């Protein structure tokens, strides 16, 4: 019999119904919060390219259907009903003993949504620092992450267009098709394995994370810090407490 159940992202493979079975068996649950899905059906707190907290402000998830936040009416309804089920049954509030957020920003949002403050704590992400690394400098601006709209990679491409003398390199898998015209100083590296990613960071000048969404606690910030590379990010979400103002 386990002493504790550690839960991370339940969706899309595990139903919140599993939490009731753990509670029935008398095993306490600690849930690590990686996004905002307990409050916002999409998990992003984002609508029309901007941060959105309407579901938090109204105390329910139906705005996801109203604004079609998943850009598919059927998908938006499905995501909303999933959250409605969890809220009506108390799947999280009744069964989870403690919530471990990765930033204080997340913690404050859960508390604002009605979760008891004494059950919500902060355990930031960590990383194993490399024993040694090569810091022979590079001259390019580095982007690390999915090439998708919420990550704001297109914003950085526009910055590259305005600064043709500076090289920009993007490491990450494409998640969407784009007809953007790519300037000559932009290079796509594709998905990089860990050793390749370490070299990519080491040889950059700095890392930029232009996310439109709040994000959780991006590991890329820690990876860059391990190699003495600063990260530039937006002044919203947990970025200000991770990077500093």
Whereabouts are the PLM-identified features?
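Membrane-proximal helix-turn-helix segments that form the acceptor-binding/catalytic region
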Residues: 24, 37, 52-98
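Carbohydrate-associated surface elements
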Residues: 105, 126
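Glycosyltransferase donor-sugar binding loop
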Residues: 144, 166-180
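Nucleotide-activated donor-binding/catalytic signature segment of Leloir-type glycosyltransferases, i.e.
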Residues: 178-198
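Short alpha-helical segment that forms part of, or immediately flanks, the ligand-binding pocket
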Residues: 198, 221-226, 240-241
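Acidic donor-binding loop of glycosyltransferase active sites
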Residues: 202-216, 229
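Short hydrophobic beta-strand element within catalytic cores of glycosyltransferases
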Residues: 221, 230-233
